[in-house]
Amino acid sequence: MSIRIAIAAAAALLTQEAAAPRMVVIDGEAVKRDEPPPHGNIGMSTAYRYSDAVPGRAMEFRKRVLHVGAAIGAHKLAHDEVYYVLSGEGEAFSGDRTAPVKAGQAIYFFDGETMGIRQKGAQPLALIISYPLAVRARAR
């Protein structure tokens, strides 16, 4: 009987280790890097790739600061995306629509649209970007 209990306990422990954790806390400085923005390498940006370190995640969550003159170039979406403007000003576009954006606004981009966003003005454009993954990331 005690062998069965030990086997069951070991199996439960292995299952817990293979599953995604209940919570992950990520320090922004640990995931910060300067790089050209995606989709065209237009200018420079500072990327905070928060969700990259999260095992078993189902979504991306990032902060990107577009330096003066930088842009995330036009690209067709395979999912919905939300961009939240933390600071600065920019111009978002989707299909044939263009709109100015500023701090405190969110832009909801839809699956199948071709979209992008560019920094405008004297200050960098700081964004939070979130979207679902097509396939859940592997648990580590």
Language-model segments: which ranges?
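Sec-dependent signal peptide recognition
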Residues: 1-8
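A short, N-terminal "cap"/entry segment at the start of jelly-roll beta-barrel domains
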Residues: 13-58, 138-140
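Ligand-binding loop in jelly-roll beta-barrel domains
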Residues: 56, 111-136
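Conserved short histidine dyad/triad with adjacent acidic residue
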Residues: 60-77
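Short beta-strand segments in beta-sandwich/barrel cores
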Residues: 70-72, 88-93
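Glycine- and acidic-residue-biased ligand/ion/polar-headgroup-sensing regions
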Residues: 78-90
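Short acidic-glycine-tyrosine-enriched beta hairpin
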Residues: 97-112
